[in-house]
Amino acid sequence: MNSITMQLQADKLIRMALEEDITSEDVSTNAVMPTNVKGTVDLIAKEDGVIAGMDVYARVFKLMDESMEIEMFCHDGDEVKKGDLMAKVTGDIRVLLSGERVALNYLQRMSGIATYTRSVVKLLEGSGVTLLDTRKTTPNCRVFEKYAVRVGGGCNHRYNLSDGVLLKDNHIGAAGSITKAIQMAKAYAPFVRKIEIETETLEQVAEAVEAGADIIMLDNMTPEVMKQAVALIDGRAQTECSGNITKENIARIREIGVDFVSSGALTHSAPILDISMKNLHAV
């Protein structure tokens, strides 16, 4: 785990996940498995994809029993093929069985996001457009999901509400206008913070430019209107395209000339990558 934020938060969140799943005991495992029996199990890819979350997977077992041994044959960012042996985990069989679901949930989810993100990044190659995620993440899993986006080749937008100013339609409504919202943000936020504002029409784009926005989000615009907006902005602000952007329609953004494209689908719609723990046996 390369992110300092992830290192600080991971153990706490993993413990919460284990407590949610195991609570007082794993009655199924404890009913059929005596204590202190050592075993080993294989981690196997059941489909092609990009791996993210190997350290999180390993950490689940280490938090349950520090003596657990994890031998990894792939690492975050690697592309695996169906049938590839990804790791071997050795230790108390009760720990292997009780921690399996939580460990796989993290690994499958994170690898699914990394796989989906990389496929979208490839569609944008050569365009100069930077792919961003959003805050549309699973509660208490943002640190893992945004990390997976980076593994897949995307970039993180704001991690939380303190990371930057993004004035959306309801902020504008509360302030009274785009101009007033930007003026208030400039007066409140530190000067090093960029001011981004959401626009839906060319009239709003023009107002945002005149008010001095640093980044102008072009939200739910057609490709034709976005082209007009980029021409209207004419380099006076950075541009971000947003609104129902998916792998299926992102290719239309390539030639428009925006700087960024943000997609909530990277985290809220990426399917999991099918990964399994198989061949458990005593050693």
Give, region by region, the residue ranges found by the protein language model:
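Cytosolic regulatory modules rich in charged/polar residues
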Residues: 242-243, 261, 278
